[in-house]
Amino acid sequence: MPRSLKKGPFIDLHLLKKVEAAVEKNDRKPVKTWSRRSMILPQMVGLTIAVHNGRQHVPVLVSEDMVGHKLGEFAATRTYRGHVADKKGKR
């Protein structure tokens, strides 16, 4: 269920400060964050944000289509290795 419009978008304050500093300096370095729950704002477009997936930081280049989504949607936490082949079926 989406967040109420009267509440506004959620973004962690420490991430917002890092993003504003990167925009102000015109810094191309990735902004490292553990905040997967923060929403992508229009001022983040063009920045590279390194989102933690539980093991490493995945670089995410923010585009206009991503605005309104959460950062965690773009850094998968699970790796799918396919289904194991059935040994009986190979005979």
Curated annotation (Swiss-Prot):
PROSITE patterns referenced in this protein's UniProt entry, alphabetically: RIBOSOMAL_S19
Pfam families referenced in this protein's UniProt entry, alphabetically: Ribosomal_S19
One Gene Ontology term of the molecular function aspect: rRNA binding
Database matches in Gene3D superfamilies: 30s Ribosomal Protein S19, Chain A
InterPro entries: Ribosomal_uS19, Ribosomal_uS19_bac-type, Ribosomal_uS19_CS, Ribosomal_uS19_SF
Entry similarity comment: Belongs to the universal ribosomal protein uS19 family.
Physiological role: Protein S19 forms a complex with S13 that binds strongly to the 16S ribosomal RNA.
Name used for this protein in its record: Small ribosomal subunit protein uS19
